[in-house]
Amino acid sequence: MLKIDKVLSAPHGIAAVLVRRAPKLVLPFGERSKSRLRAVLDNGDEAALFLPRGTVLRGGDLLIAEDGSFVEVQAAAERVLEVRAADQHGLMRAAYHLGNRHTPVEVGRDYLRLEFDPVLADMLARLRVQAVQIDAPFEPEAGAYGGGHKHGHDATFAEDYAAAQAVFHEHHGHDHDHGHSHSHSHSHSHSHSHSHDHDHDHDHEHDVKGHVHGPGCGHKH
């Protein structure tokens, strides 16, 4: 059994003749997202992968076995939804709603691809875009803050989430602090700007400009 613990991401610069001669590891996206895997190559040999956690293999990547031999990765055809629209706006709307659902999406020049899901297929139909079930290789976008395909239960998800939060606070932290300070300053000033004889145990959140003084208001004038 070949033991594989190294990967050269495409484009890797290895001579084309060596790549052509190398056995192929043909896997769907879900299997290519595993750092520990046993698989059978196209020549019948068995291989055991021990790759760094978080590694996602892409079609064209080259694996290096312990004996120095090469294995080329190929993306297997799998059942996916291919989304097309009459214009770019329709495709952008579809991408937006899929992103809100944290769905892995492959972004092409004029199409989107995602793993087949009948619920998402129904949503896309409601968005008035064309979603057709086909068999094709699936190469979704990598995470913006990490190297691959992440879910909430993955070991590296927390790291990616922390990185995303840090970037958010770096760009928005000042504005947030300013708004918070302003809110408390206004509340303090408002609470001391009036003299009332009635009990303050009730929730005092009425707007100043909306408060009308008149008979029965409970204030002494």
Curated annotation (Swiss-Prot):
Residues 181-193 have a biased composition (Basic residues). It is found in: Cytoplasm. InterPro entries: UreE, UreE_C_dom, UreE_N, UreE_N_sf. Residues 171-221 are annotated as: Disordered. GO terms for biological process: protein folding; protein-containing complex assembly; urea metabolic process. SUPFAM superfamilies: Urease metallochaperone UreE, C-terminal domain, Urease metallochaperone UreE, N-terminal domain. Residues 171-180, 194-210 have a biased composition (Basic and acidic residues). It holds the Pfam family UreE_N. Keywords: Chaperone, Cytoplasm, Nickel, Nickel insertion. GO terms for cellular component: cytoplasm. Belongs to the UreE family. Involved in urease metallocenter assembly. Binds nickel. Probably functions as a nickel donor during metallocenter assembly. This is Urease accessory protein UreE. It comes from Cupriavidus pinatubonensis (strain JMP 134 / LMG 1197) (Cupriavidus necator (strain JMP 134)).
